[in-house]
Amino acid sequence: MIKIDAQSVDFYYGDFHALKNISMQIEANTSVAFIGPSGCGKSTFLRLFNRMNDLIPDTRLEGKIFIDGRNIYSKGEKVDTLRKNVGMVFQKPNPFPKTIFENVAYGLRVNGIKDNEYIEETVVKSLKQ
């Protein structure tokens, strides 16, 4: 069973063409290694699977990526739900390009907490620990 299906993926940082025509299928319950020199696009490609590159200004994806048969870049796809199901663990810390406060508050907000006073208290308490 195919878990991830990347079809004719091209990715750009501004005018820089970082990924060129990548197509691959990854079976469910398998291990895959992406090996290559620094700067060749491994992390860029992996970040496409939970749309972390959406947070970087002036980027563009061409092609399609399906996870469990769903096009994760289709209109109406809920990014928060996707990120709950597709996690990333990086060798080096990789905070979202936001303030420290917003990075810590992100987990609360993505889980539906809207009470700003509660969010502020929780973030401050967490940062003091």
List PLM regions with ranges.
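Short coil-to-beta microelement around the adenine-binding A-loop and adjacent beta1/P-loop entry
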Residues: F16-H17, D80
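The feature captures the beta-strand-to-loop junction immediately N-terminal to the Walker
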Residues: I35-P37
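Conserved catalytic motifs of ABC-family nucleotide-binding domains
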Residues: L55-P57, P93-E102
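Conserved ABC ATPase "signature" region
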Residues: K64-N71, R109-G112, N116-Q129
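ABC ATPase NBD Q-loop/coupling interface
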Residues: D10, K64-T81
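ABC transporter nucleotide-binding domains
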Residues: K78-V86, Q91, T122
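Conserved short hydrophobic alpha-helix within the nucleotide-binding domain
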Residues: F49-N50, I100, V104-A105
